[in-house]
Each structure stands twice: as C-alpha cells, then as structure tokens.
C-alpha cells in the first residue's frame, strides 16, 4: 500500500520495504523527500507534532511520565521560523535531515542526505536561500 501511494504521489525513486524504515531495502531521494515533506506539512496534525521540542505523556499506571525529545537541529537551536520536520539515520544512508522554515510569508525546505553535520549545514543552506529571495 505504501509503495502504491508513493507512485500515486509521483515519488519515483522511493521504495518502502518496511513501515519504520530501519531495515535494508528502503530507499528514496532528495526530490521525493521534498515532495513528501510538502504533503506532510499540509496536514495540521503533522505540523503540530513536528514543531515540538519535546512531548511528555502521562502513564495511567502510578502516574509516571514519559518524555520524548525531538532531534530537529533547527528547532533545538531556535532557528528563526523553524516549523519542523525530521531527522533520520541508518548505516547505509548516514545522517539525514528534512527541515522546514517559514519566514516573511515564504516557506522553504532543506533536504540533507548522508550529511556529516546537519545542524551546521541546514542553517547555512537556508540562510543562503532566504538571502536570495
């Protein structure tokens, strides 16, 4: 089903071997991840989730809490206008990051694949892109 949906969306270099993406056989490219990002950010529920630095849940047993922390470097560093999205890592793909920033009525995204330092590279690319607008 996921692969059929990917084709429907025009994600020509994307193939899913699993829903979690951690095993061999999953693949994509920067263009497809950019398209998928645009589709995801059109969903209000997704936007609310990916902009958070952390989320905590209360467990019904003994009132304990579970804290989940996001790893989005733009959100963590307080990059101006950062509104989401997602980091990822596998041995095959290396460090990957997709980020979205809204500033001055414009929304830009950055896709980094196999990046040595997404926290360094993403802001530089976005700064350069916003400077050209």
Q: Where do the language-model regions lie?
A:
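Penicillin-recognizing serine hydrolase domain
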Residues: 1-133
């Amino acid at each position: 089903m996921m692969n059929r949906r990917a084709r429907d969306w025009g994600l020509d270099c994307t193939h899913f071997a699993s829903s979690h993406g951690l095993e061999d056989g999953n693949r994509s490219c920067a263009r497809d991840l950019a398209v998928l990002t645009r589709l995801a950010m059109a969903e209000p529920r997704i936007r609310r989730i990916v902009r958070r630095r952390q989320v905590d849940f209360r467990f019904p047993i003994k009132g304990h809490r579970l804290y989940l922390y996001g790893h989005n470097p733009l959100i963590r560093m307080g990059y101006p206008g950062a509104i989401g999205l997602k980091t990822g890592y596998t041995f095959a793909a290396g460090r990957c990051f997709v980020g979205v920033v809204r500033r001055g009525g414009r929304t830009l995204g950055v896709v980094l694949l196999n990046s040595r330092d997404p926290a360094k590279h993403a802001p530089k690319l976005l700064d350069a892109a916003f400077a050209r607008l």
